[in-house]
Structures are given as structure tokens and as C-alpha cells.
Amino acid sequence: MNDRFDLPSAPFDLEGPLAPYAAHSAQTRGRVHAEPPSTSRTEFQRDRDRIIHSTAFRRLEYKTQVFVNHEGDLFRTRLTHSLEVAQIARSIARSLRLNEDLVEAVSLAHDLGHTPFGHAGQDALNDCMKPYGGFEHNLQSLLVVDRLEERYGGFDGLNLTFETREGILKHCSRNNAATLGDLGRRFLEGQQPSLEAQLANLADEVAYNNHDIDDGLRSGLITLEQLEDVPLWAIHRREAEAAFPAVSGRRLINETIRRIINALIVDLIGTTRAGIAEFAPQCIDDVRAAPALVAFSEPMHEEARVLKRFLFDNLYRHYLVMRMSAKARRIIDDLFRVFMDDPRLLPPQYQAKSNPDEQPRWIAHYIAGMTDRYAIKEHRRIFAVDAV
């Protein structure tokens, strides 16, 4: 019996019936280092697979959103968050006939450059790096996939397609954009990225707002009574109670969050379809020249803004979270300063890479790549008298 079969040389039919304004793998702007095409996967599938197998992606399991990793087993990490973003984005992409593989790749990679300890860690590292160009996690995510991953013999990084790299770089200063060639041009010329990149950005917002509600309630740092002041919560909590009168507690919370996520997704799809109908893009170049087309309606945008404000005031600024953030900032600041004062304390591979001019940036790379637990242990090893 002959089990061999012929595969197509360019498997772009695997993408299905995409809209003309979607990003098509056959029309990719390519990779920095030329590679032969796969006979079994599209270019964006290859990007997704490379991201999943990267060291930086595995480390996301031990990097936090809001809570320090060891504070609770049920709290979300950067890894679970990235998976949730990818699921939301991929579902919306299918409804809009966008490229599911590209939107998944961008979603999975968008947090690869995040520091340990969430935003507190990023703010601390940025403060340390201000004399040396600053630190920004979106640009760091790009550096991870372009340079810092070491998986291939022929090049540094993952050698991802232009479209995936573009989606990872959500924000960029004009100064940094000027150094990035074609990738930075849209920030200088006021153009938009692909619809897939726009979608991944808003799916990130949908995921973290709603899942921070969940984690905040689990931790006891916010209460159901407080949430009643948030219209988006109150409306869908009442709907959930009306639909399931016998349900209460954790199940009612889950049902309410599910309904909020669904409402946001339905609104986003409807608003985006209306924008596409109005501007009628016929190709991805038309998308780049149009205003942002993936969007919430104004009423939903306002409701989401109120929710974000609530989380900022009641969760992210809760005194226990602020204590964790203060500890995180101290750890990051201490590590950066001790490595700057004596680079011999760095692991050998970072000493070898770190000439005097590049030393601050490589120290930032080292710290940004740490997990929460590793950063705590490294701090203890260096500063605790009884540690070895």
C-alpha cells in the first residue's frame, strides 16, 4: 500500500474563503530572511507555530497580569491571557472573513515582551532605562521575535512575516518608528495596520477587562456590590438572573461575564461590518489608507471606558495590589542597578553580549525575560545574606 501523497507547493487554499480586504498569506510582504515556502502550512500558520514553540511563549506561564504568580493558582497569567485573546480574536475573524491564522499569531505574540510583575514591572524597567532610550513592551515583543529568540541556525529571532510583526507592534514612538524601516512607516505616515492586527488589539481589551473582573472577585479585592455601579456589569447581571433565577454565586458571576464578552463581541462585529461597508476596502492597501475599521460603537466604547475606570480605581489601585507593585518595582530597580554597577554579576551569556555601549539594553533584555518567580529568586540570590 502506498501511503505517499502529493502536497501542493503553496497551500494558500488552507485559508478558506477570505474577504478581499483580509491579509492573504499568498500576498505577504515576506520575511527578513528568505525561506522556501512550506508544502503543508501557510506563512501565517508557520508564524503561529514558531511563536508557540518559542522560549518566550513558555515563560508567559509564569508572568502575571495583576497578581504575583504564586498568590493563587486560579489567577490569570500572561499565557492564559494570550490564549483567551487568541480565542476571542479568532472567533471574530471568522465572522468577518479575516485571516484566522494571522490574527491568532498576533494574539499569541502580543505579550512576549512583557516584564515580570505586569505593568508595575514595565513601569519600573522603563524608569531605569529612561537615560538609555526607555523600555516599551510592544517594542520588546518585536525584539523578542526579531532578535532575542535563539532557535534557528540561519538567523536570530523567529523570522516572522511582516504582517505578524506589524500586528505585534501596536504602539511605537516616532523616534523608534524611524529606525524600523517599512515596519515603522505607518506610525510616521498615519496609516493603519491590517484588520487582523486591529482585531487582535481590541480582542486584548475585551479579554483583560472581563478577566480582571473575574480575578478581582476571586481575590476579594472588588465586590459584587461595587460592580453594580458599572452599567455594563449591572445590565448583564440582571439578564443572567432573569434567565437563570435559581443560579447564584460563582456560576452567576461566570454567566454575567460570559454575557458581557458576548455583548462586546457582537457590538464589535456589527460596528466593524458597518465601517467596512462604508469605506468598501477592496484590498489590504485600502485598509491601510482608511481610518481604523475594527471598532466598538460609541455607546459600547463609553460603557467599556467606565468599566476600565472602575478597574483602575478599585482593583489596580487597591492597596494590596499597590503593595505587590511596590515590591515588584523594588526588585526590578535593585536588579537593574546592581547589574549596571557590576556586570560581572550577570549570567555569562549576557556578559559576553554586553559591551559598554549596549550594556543597559542587554540588562533590560535579561530582566524583561525573567518570570515573576525567577526575578524574586534572582533578587534573593544577590541581596539575601543567607542565599547562595
UniProtKB/Swiss-Prot annotation:
Residues 24-44 are annotated as: Disordered. InterPro entries: dGTPase, dGTPase-like, dNTPase_2, HD/PDEase_dom, HD_domain, PHydrolase_assoc_dom. One of its GO terms (biological process) is dGTP catabolic process. Pfam families: HD, HD_assoc. The keyword ATP-binding does not apply. Residues 78-209 form the HD domain. This is Deoxyguanosinetriphosphate triphosphohydrolase-like protein.
